[in-house]
Amino acid sequence: MERVQPWLAPFTWAMVTAQNAMLCAAKNALHKPTSDGHAVTEDLWENRHHESMSLDEAVDLCRCCHRMAPFCLYNGNTFSSIIALVIRKLDLPPTEGQIVRSLAGHIVAGVASDEEERAFREFCASLS
């Protein structure tokens, strides 16, 4: 598996928006763009998501977009679920896959400890 590739290329902004809408619908929550963060986040995503980057850079882009709060609710869940789908494509053994998805999700949500961040970065460095 190539360490640098367009990990997020399949996820257009329309797909990001649909993912947020599904997460909101599942909880009967308001799905609506924010006035401050939506347009700038969409621009960032559309300019970067198709680029080749390392997996940890893809996680960082998702974290950045989460922090920009493009939607009223479930920003963290939206971008965490996207990176989880990317990691599922790595076809890792089940336990390792769950650990890597959990680490990435914590990083995107901004709740990862230094140890979790270090473990994830080491995993990313191990990709050939």
Where are these regions (language model features)?
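FIC/Doc superfamily catalytic core
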Residues: M1-S128
